[in-house]
């Protein structure tokens, strides 16, 4: 467990002050709403893109779904940067989320490449394969953030258990 008596060598994901700021800011709720919405848009869009690639039908629906997914991605990136500023004091690349932010830029680059392909009239299949590449990187990036969420929960449980042990020890 991070920064616990059992494993003091692991750095905590949040300091007490950062955790308090994280819990107090409305941007945490914004992220908590946008992340599942983006995942839902991803799931629907993935089905539509694969359907188009297999059948050649549904290009418009797949395109609209990719645009919605991309808009959600850009929105969550901007609001996430604001969240990082509030919690960690910098807009991006806070040490606790450095690699997630680095990989996020790859995800954004591929989604932006899709927009380029769409707006410059590249072949439909090329557009869809770029979208699939963007989605593959998104899945990896989402996994990174889910891992951090798990670490944060374990840290909170560890700190709560430590507080409980300290309280019981003082009685």
UniProtKB/Swiss-Prot annotation:
MF-aspect GO terms: hydro-lyase activity
Q: Does the keyword Lyase apply?
A: yes
Please spell out the taxonomic lineage of the organism that makes this protein: Bacteria, Pseudomonadati, Pseudomonadota, Alphaproteobacteria, Rhodobacterales
Q: Name one GO biological process term.
A: bacteriochlorophyll biosynthetic process
Keyword check for Lyase, yes or no: yes
Xref: NCBIfam families: BchF
| Pathway(s) where this gene product acts | Porphyrin-containing compound metabolism; bacteriochlorophyll biosynthesis (light-independent)
Q: Which organism is it from?
A: Rhodobacter capsulatus (strain ATCC BAA-309 / NBRC 16581 / SB1003)
InterPro entries attached to this UniProt entry: BCHF
UniProt KW keywords: Bacteriochlorophyll biosynthesis, Chlorophyll biosynthesis, Lyase, Photosynthesis
Q: Where are the transmembrane segments?
A: none
Q: What is its EC number?
A: 4.2.1.-
Q: What is this protein called?
A: 2-vinyl bacteriochlorophyllide hydratase
One Pfam match, given by its short name, reads BCHF
Which gene name does the record give? Answer: bchF
> So which domain of life are we looking at?
Bacteria
């Amino acid at each position: 467990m991070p920064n616990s008596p059992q494993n003091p060598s692991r750095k905590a994901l949040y300091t007490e002050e950062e955790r308090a700021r994280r819990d107090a800011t409305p941007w945490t709720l914004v992220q908590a709403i946008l992340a599942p919405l983006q995942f839902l848009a991803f799931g629907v869009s993935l089905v539509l893109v694969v359907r188009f690639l297999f059948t050649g039908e549904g290009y418009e629906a797949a395109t609209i779904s990719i645009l919605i997914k991309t808009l959600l991605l850009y929105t969550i990136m901007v609001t996430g940067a604001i969240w990082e500023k509030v919690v960690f004091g910098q807009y991006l690349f806070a040490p606790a989320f450095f690699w997630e932010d680095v990989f996020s830029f790859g995800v954004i680059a591929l989604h932006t490449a899709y927009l380029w392909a769409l707006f410059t009239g590249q072949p439909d299949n090329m557009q869809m394969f770029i979208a699939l590449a963007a989605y593959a990187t998104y899945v990896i990036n989402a996994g990174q953030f889910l891992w951090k969420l798990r670490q944060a929960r374990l840290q909170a449980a560890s700190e709560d258990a430590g507080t409980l042990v300290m309280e019981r020890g003082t009685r």
